[in-house]
């Protein structure tokens, strides 16, 4: 079996990456950069974001400051690989979002949306089914259940359980609104940068990365992808407990 290791290029991880490579080789795995069967994500949630988009099953090794979805401790990595060879694991599938703009499609694991570009409020129109609403503030994000434990939680203080079939529309620092988010079934929706009487630009973001700038009256479409992110689980993932611990609740 062939594996690819994904991690941040930091000096703090050098020894851990070397250990991961040595164990993989010892157990008969070939470490490669392409034509691989599995991805080994070593780090935290940011590393996982990159790993799941490789379109292969992911082994999530926790070696970062924050890794709510990482279940394999470094000292149990060898045990995890042995169990992989035996087929002794569970495969979890996670929702992915597609952001469509200018005939391009970007894939998101946590969230996609529109955020302000300059230090001023923007007005975002939200459309799905027969609903048409506008929210003024710092922007609007559309989050997967797993994404609600990241950026979404800092904006809403709420959590969607990881295998819930729903998406969360998050209002980022809304003006004059007490409502912080709305949870809806996984259906397509449109986000539009509305006209406030003068030209504005906003950032279209996917998993915290700016993918393009949009102008007044331009829009993006968000829908649930037919693709799923696959993470192989070897140890129990106590998501709610990890969230409480991470935020010192």
UniProtKB/Swiss-Prot annotation:
S-S bonds: none
Pfam families: NAD_kinase (PF01513), NAD_kinase_C (PF20143)
GO biological process, one term: NAD metabolic process
Assigned keywords, A-Z: ATP-binding, Cytoplasm, Kinase, NAD, NADP, Nucleotide-binding, Transferase
Catalyzed reaction equations: NAD(+) + ATP = ADP + NADP(+) + H(+)
Top-rank EC class of the record's enzyme: transferase
GO molecular-function terms, A-Z: ATP binding; metal ion binding; NAD+ kinase activity
Binding site for NAD(+): 45-46, 50, 110-111, 138, 149-154
A cellular component term, taken from the record's GO annotations: cytoplasm
Catalytic residues (UniProt): 45
Entry EC no(s): 2.7.1.23
Cofactor(s) needed by this chain: a divalent metal cation
Subcellular location: Cytoplasm
UniProt entry tagged with the keyword Transferase: yes
Protein family (similarity comment): Belongs to the NAD kinase family.
Alphabetical list of HAMAP family matching this protein: NAD_kinase
Protein's job: Involved in the regulation of the intracellular balance of NAD and NADP, and is a key enzyme in the biosynthesis of NADP. Catalyzes specifically the phosphorylation on 2'-hydroxyl of the adenosine moiety of NAD to yield NADP.
Name by which UniProt lists this protein: NAD kinase
Species of origin: Saccharolobus islandicus (strain L.S.2.15 / Lassen #1) (Sulfolobus islandicus)
